[in-house]
Amino acid sequence: RMCNEKIYRDMKLKIHFSHKEELWNSWSHAGGILMGFVVGAIFLYWCFTMHNGWATAGVILYLFGMLMSYIASTVYHAVSAWSKWKERLRKWDHAAIYWHIAGSYSPITLIAMRDQGYWGWSLFIFIWACAIAGTIMSFARLKDHSNLETICFVGMGLSVLVAFKPLIDSVSTATVWWIIAEGVCYITGAVFYSINKKKYMHSVFHFFVLAGSICHIIAVWDILMKYI
């Protein structure tokens, strides 16, 4: 009996969200999955129609990162807090955020910035290297470095500032503003993520992520219209 009580206490400590919160967390990013498939079909149809290999590669990586992130998040939050899969899915959820960020950079670096000297390829390689390293880190003990992960997410997102001049030389002014708006959404979301022990703050974070994704979708569409 004492052993069972200890297990119960240990599992209870792992529960951060109520059932209603988890419903909001799950369904909000389920909307991201639907959005990703609809937008993906449109983007890929356009790339295939224009017979542009680089655009197709950039869009596929982008869709992979975005969809894996939303799928991992949706499944993780949908699974019962008492499930043995919960902790494993949490690791995938965190790892997929790195893929989402790296995927978001792919259309920019492989389409718009590919001819900007070494900038496009350097940024592409750096971001995906960070994603691989972040994935490895995510499968370590997350509670030991959760704040470090948040810093890494924001750092990866802001790394485009290093190549900001080549970026604005490659895309339209409207695209730049959409990317800036995206960054504002993600950084604001990160603030709510950092206080997610307060009720529904994690759900608010999810909606800011969705808003950032919408901004990036518009930016990628602008890039596709300009280059293919």
Put a short name on every predicted segment.
Residues 3-228:
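Multi-pass alpha-helical transmembrane bundles in non-GPCR membrane proteins
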